[in-house]
């Protein structure tokens, strides 16, 4: 389904039917992009298990709020690195190895 494969910016809600959790994860991951996603469930542990399987840089579980201290950035063709938190600082560092 096209809407699930494009990176859309804006207030968009897509409702897509799925057979089971494996199918839902397959649909969520079937994209060239992976900036963020969301999982809603009455069972928080189950929602977290699904969120861990999603190939996105951020996943809100049950509408979790944005955390400015958490690293932010996408997977695959989304974004250009990480912002915020220690991973955001790493974007400005270069590693050097010296052998004597």
Residue spans of the language-model regions?
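Conserved C-terminal structural/oligomerization subdomain of aldehyde/semialdehyde dehydrogenase
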Residues: 1-100
């Amino acid at each position: 389904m096209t809407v699930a494969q494009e990176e859309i910016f804006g207030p968009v809600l897509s409702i897509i039917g799925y057979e089971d959790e494996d199918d839902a994860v397959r649909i969520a991951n079937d994209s060239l992009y992976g900036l963020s996603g969301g999982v809603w469930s009455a069972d928080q542990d189950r929602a977290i298990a699904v969120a861990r399987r999603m190939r996105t840089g951020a996943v809100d579980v049950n509408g979790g709020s944005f955390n400015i201290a958490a690293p932010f950035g996408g997977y695959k063709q989304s974004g250009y690195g990480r912002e915020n938190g220690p991973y955001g600082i790493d974007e400005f560092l270069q590693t050097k190895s010296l052998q004597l």
